[in-house]
Curated annotation (Swiss-Prot):
Subunit structure: In the presence of PdxT, forms a dodecamer of heterodimers.
MF term (GO), any: pyridoxal 5'-phosphate synthase (glutamine hydrolysing) activity
Keyword Transport: no
Binding site for D-glyceraldehyde 3-phosphate: 174
Binding-site positions, D-ribose 5-phosphate: 33, 162, 223, 244-245
Keyword Lyase attached: yes
UniProt keywords, alphabetically: Lyase, Pyridoxal phosphate, Schiff base
Protein's name in the database: Pyridoxal 5'-phosphate synthase subunit PdxS
Active site positions, chain numbering: 90 (schiff-base intermediate with d-ribose 5-phosphate)
EC number: 4.3.3.6
Length: 303
């Protein structure tokens, strides 16, 4: 898998090492959802390491319902032109043509995202065929390893997007971390059984067991609305944070964005966290995840 796969519309190649290296450069940072060039500029000024360009933040996607698809190319290009930091954009699970379009537009990363309506309930995108690196969500180690096998260069624990409720984010991050720790104590013959249970290649399972971590960057997402939320996820083992509705659905987006960036950097310093948490205004109202019926939970999408 170290050899590059080539996309039909490009004569460039992107090896796993290059793609994963690009994701490594975002470690320790915050990636913010933005729907306009102005929001993108606010995110960049606040210290975001990248922005996610989309037409509706997850809270609006959840509230408005219907089929949610890739954003309009004009909107994505407007955000690319507005900032100097990397720009990500979302494609539907399994929709390889949306991914081809996003690569053609020149986005820096494609997020094969459960926030959008899945296009294929059996297959995820073959990410090895693309030069652009992919981000994918996971609720457990098995999901993460299957996405890496398909070519993902970054994993984000899913959480429950658009809620402002961090409980699922903590559940998924603890689950992934706990399953990795379990692997590290196994003998090689036990790892064969673990690979079957995880539905992942044995060689990849062994690599994780020996390293005690994923071979790609692990961010967190879903329900992060305050500096304390971001710091907690970093203390639980996240290497960076995605923030969606939590910033631009709040009372003071500019200040909250900067506070979450600082909290992500100084996640283990309670004095700094207390300082940046002051006077932020009202956080997004949000939804209690327990009030969302199982079939309507976005984190359930993907397999």
């Amino acid at each position: 898998m170290e050899t590059a796969a080539q996309n039909g519309s490009s004569n460039q190649t992107g090896t796993a090492r290059v793609k994963r290296g690009m994701a490594e450069m975002l470690k320790g940072g915050v990636i913010m959802d933005v729907v306009t060039p102005e929001q993108a500029r606010i995110a960049e000024a606040a210290g975001a390491v990248a922005v996610m360009a989309l037409e509706r933040v997850p809270a609006d996607i959840r509230a408005q319902g219907g089929v949610s698809r890739m954003s309009d190319p004009d909107m994505i290009e407007g955000i690319i032109d507005a900032v100097t930091i990397p720009v990500m954009a979302k494609a539907r699970i399994g929709h390889f043509v949306e991914a081809q379009i996003l690569q053609s537009l020149g986005v820096d990363y494609v997020d094969e995202s459960e926030v959008l309506t899945p296009a294929d309930y059996t297959n995820h995108i073959d990410k090895w065929k693309f030069t652009v690196p992919f981000v994918c969500g996971a609720t457990n180690l098995g999901e993460a390893l299957r996405r890496i096998t398909e070519g993902a260069a970054m994993i984000r624990s899913k959480g429950e997007a658009g809620t402002g409720d961090v409980s699922n984010a903590t559940t998924h991050m603890r689950k992934i971390g706990g399953e990795i720790r379990r692997l590290t104590s196994m003998s090689e013959d036990e790892l064969y059984v673990a690979a079957k249970e995880l539905q992942a290649p044995y060689e990849l399972v062994v690599e994780v067991a020996r390293a005690g971590k994923l071979p790609v960057t692990l961010f967190t997402a879903g329900g992060i609305a305050t500096p304390a939320d971001a710091a907690m996820m970093m203390q639980l083992g996240a290497e960076g944070v995605f923030v969606g509705s939590g910033i631009f659905k709040s009372g003071n987006p500019e200040q909250r964005a900067a506070a979450i960036v600082k909290a992500t950097t100084f996640y283990d310093d309670p004095d700094v966290l207390a300082k940046v948490s002051r006077g932020l205004g009202e956080a997004m109202v949000g939804i209690n995840v327990e009030e969302i019926a199982q079939p309507h939970r976005l984190a359930e999408r993907g397999w």
